[in-house]
Amino acid sequence: GWVKFCEYYYPELIGNLSSCKSPQQMMGAVVKTYYAKEKGLNPENIFSVAIMPCTAKKAECKRPEMNSAGHEHGNADIMDVDCVITTRELAQLIKSKKINLNNLADVKYDSILGESTGAGVIFGTTGGVMEAAIRTLYYNVTKDNPPEELLNWQSVRGLNGVKEATVSVPGVGEVSIAVCHGLKNARTVLKKVKNKEASWQFIEFMACPGGCIGGG
């Protein structure tokens, strides 16, 4: 949602966006490359479904550039993610099939990769991407685990529309950041950026109030 908003209303800023894809699209590419190879599957026979809180993810998976796996296999028609259903749609599907989750037997999670980190858990809430990114920056630069304050970084948490903070990273210096959720707040932040009234070096935007978990 945020990327589409920027493309429509602030196309001159597209070059400043992170080149990282969303976790949905990263996982889709992994499923049809690494997973397909590990399981001996033809990626053309894999139908990859993502379950997401955000309705905008449906459009994201259909973007023509979201076919990294297709390029890997020499078939541009292979999309990384074939279909997205929202968490609300999943709940409706479960109810329509009269499935009682409490009556289902526990089974072992068939993980193809390591289980998520703490940073992965908070990724979908406002401030979560920023917190994860700063922790990663700290580790990659210093080769040490982040200090306790970066593992419980209250400055970027909470539901204020725009949050600001400065963090010191050895070898980098002071990094000025902002966290914004809700597109009304995004306009306010981007106005400051365009008018050169802001000194932020890294800004997290999420379209929905509260972050991606507020979508759907």
Model regions and ranges:
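Iron-sulfur-associated redox domains of electron-transfer enzymes in respiratory
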Residues: 1-216
